Design a protein with these regions (language model features):
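Extended, subdomain-level signal for the structured scaffold at the beginning of enzyme domains
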Residues: 1-100, 107-112, 129, 139-143, ...
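Small/polar loops that bind or transfer phosphate-bearing groups
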Residues: 7, 123, 156
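A short beta-strand/loop micro-motif in the catalytic core of glycosyltransferases
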Residues: 100-101, 121
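Short, glycine-/small-residue-rich phosphate/pyrophosphate-handling segment
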Residues: 115-133
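Active-site-proximal loop->helix
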Residues: 135-137
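Active-site rim beta-loop-alpha module in soluble metabolic enzymes
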Residues: 148
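A short glycine-threonine-serine/GTX helix/turn-capping micro-motif
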Residues: 151-157
């Protein structure tokens, strides 16, 4: 079971490391032995939206087959929605990968690639109009933390990626496994404000 997280310049940090932490914690204890890898277009390091530098494991050409793709969001998704090479790659991955997921504005890339046509999806609250502009047929859920539509799971903004990743653990292994990961990362949201 291979999970790949694509990274790119101006990706939102928590969109990448939130799901990564959940999935890596799962991989450390699961009998399924999932492998979690990060990759960029060319394998080179990227600088995220707030300045964090990430060095991925590999390139998208060398990442190999995936069972799950996680596409983060952030300001870097805006150029990707117009990048014909990236969109063609996303479409190719769709044909070979059983489960596509996105965090935050990663869903904008999926919409631009035509992968959300007529499907329910969500994104960061501030990008709901952008999602509608990219594809008017998307059934936008403005309230959900994540939307599971079978072979595509989209999540709302930033921290919602953690919720979505815990959902993936529950879906791919069991709710008990997800609870164990949640306890391990001590995730019990009760915002102070």
């Amino acid at each position: 079971l291979r999970v790949g997280i694509v990274v790119f310049d101006d990706a939102e940090e928590l969109d990448v490391v939130g799901p990564y932490d959940v999935l890596a914690a799962w991989a450390a204890t699961s009998a399924l032995r999932p492998e979690v890898v990060t990759f960029s277009a060319d394998g080179a390091g990227v600088r995220c939206a707030k300045g964090l530098r990430l060095v991925p494991d590999t390139s998208r050409d060398d990442v190999g087959p995936l069972h799950v793709l996680v596409h983060p969001g952030g300001q870097g998704t805006r150029p990707l929605t117009r990048d014909s090479e990236h969109l063609a790659w996303v479409r190719a991955v769709r044909r070979e990968t059983p489960l596509l997921t996105s965090v935050c504005t990663g869903s904008l890339v999926y919409a631009a690639a035509g992968l959300l046509a007529g499907r329910p999806a969500t994104t960061h609250w501030s990008a709901l109009d952008e999602l509608a502009e990219l594809d008017r047929s998307v059934l936008i859920d403005t309230e959900a933390r994540y939307v599971d539509d079978g072979d595509v799971v989209t999540s709302a903004g930033v921290s919602a990626g953690i919720d979505m990743a815990l959902h993936l653990v529950a879906r791919l292994e069991s709710p008990d496994a997800a609870r164990q990961v949640r306890r391990e990362i001590q995730y019990d949201p009760a915002p102070p404000v």
